[in-house]
């Protein structure tokens, strides 16, 4: 009986789906297979219809699954066998194709070797043929040269002369080539009469060169570019083209035009000579006479580049020769005239002119390179044209830029400008408010070049031509604007001109910065560091040594020689304030401009930092010395004011108080006037000026200490304590307006402790204890307590013991 009889249709269909290779999960297969084995009950539940039937169905299913498994296994084995057979066939075909490709590759190698052998053979054959042809030509040429030589030996060079007369380019070119070769041959021949033959050949060569140049020049005048190119090529073959290049350059209308010549008088009348010597005006970007020449030159090059490139076989050589002539003649002649005029004006005019010239030349070279590049010439950094232009410019400037001469001029100019700007300061130091005769002219002359100036007390100044120098010297503007001649009698010098002036230094630093920038333009990188170092040292010497430090030393001398019985004139505090500003400008300039400056080496930077550090240290030390001397001088005068009143004693009875009233009023009035005088001076010079605040604090502290010491000069009775309190209150009120917190605190502390002098002896210990609880130190308590006239012996002994344990007070 077939197992399928135990299966229903749905189960058979399910098994057939497996046979059709439909993938069904095992769990789903079992559920679908078992669905037909259950019956649905009335309550909706399912119940196995028959156990035997179910067993038979599962047995039949298992049998079918085994049969299906066997069939699938047979198929797998069939597929594996077929796959193995296909793989074997593939390997066989692959090996066969590999062998064929190897054979083809070997044949290709043999073929390539054969081709290379053939190529090598052909090349060798070609070279042999070329050598044979060259030998044939040399033989023919040698034969021709011998024939030509014999013609010259006989004195009748008919063949070459016929070539020359044909007016045919190829024949003329052949004539030039053969003549050049013949000349070389004749120099090596050593036969009888060979010198005469050589002379005839040389004469013929000169004849050819002269006529070819004439023909070239005729074509140039037409102009006929094709004819110029023809004769240019002939001359290139004849002598390398040197003569034709010279002919072209020398005959160029740029060099022979009459309008290129400018009169010396017209050049000297250029308004630029009113600007260049004046440091207060900006440096002009160009000099008109050079600018017009450079513009015309650029136009000529832009127009002739195409002609030169079309006519000459080696246009770069022609351009180099052209530029050499331009820089070495046209520009040099014009530049020498300009610099000669500048030299006669002043060192500053010369240096500024040179700076403008160098900037203009660099722009010219850059413009020429741009023109050449646009015309198809190579102007890279290492190209012949670029190197030639740079070299011509450097050679042109060599006579004008020599490091020692430049530095000498720059230092002389800066030194002269600085001294002229301090004219009124210097004059006041010599003759107070009366100008020193001849001083202004002596300071102006170094800035006027070769100008012949009147000397002596009758010097006159032209406000039109010398106005800028008078402004530098700080002469009144109304005199300069008058446009007339003035003498030193017109000049007013006031007391305020005797002080340091930070604005003068600020202007001078600007001139120094211009010199620094000029050095970076004119001086090579190898020498720039040395030049900058020299200029910085000059700046330090002029500002610190010759100006600031000298003035501080003068102030110190004034204070030390001052009569202590008279009020100290603090006019010099203006110089302290200006000194601080000057050193601020100096420091900022070195740190922000000089040290980061391009071209400064590490050693130069260290040197600059050392200069700055040394300058600040020296000036600060000098300022502190002035402060110290000022404070002591003010204290000395206060001591003189207080000395007549030291006879006033606070150890007095109530009956004696009235007798001291008039004397005490005189003391307070004199002290009040003196302290107000000092305070008003500080206030007038600047109540919030940081450069004077430290001095004001030191002065107030010193004065307070002296007044307190004066108040504590004697023993105090209970009645005298009231007078002492009044005096301390007066001193406090006088110094309170100074706004010094430490001084104010000191007086308040003393006033709070004065009750120790007023209470009776029996309550003194209790009052002392209260002061301790209030936070007053034992030292402060004892400082006041020791003034009591009636201090008990036990407290005196205690004070002496404690005083021995305390460190000595510093002044």
UniProtKB/Swiss-Prot annotation:
Belongs to the SEC10 family. The keyword Coiled coil applies. Keywords: Coiled coil, Exocytosis, Protein transport, Transport. InterPro entries: Sec10-like (IPR009976), Sec10_HB (IPR048627), Sec10_N (IPR048625). This is Exocyst complex component sec10. One of its GO terms (cellular component) is cell tip. One of its GO terms (biological process) is vesicle tethering involved in exocytosis. It comes from the Eukaryota. Disulfide bonds: none annotated. The exocyst complex is composed of sec3, sec5, sec6, sec8, sec10, sec15, exo70 and exo84. Interacts with dil1. Component of the exocyst complex involved in the docking of exocytic vesicles with fusion sites on the plasma membrane. Residues 106-147 form a coiled coil.
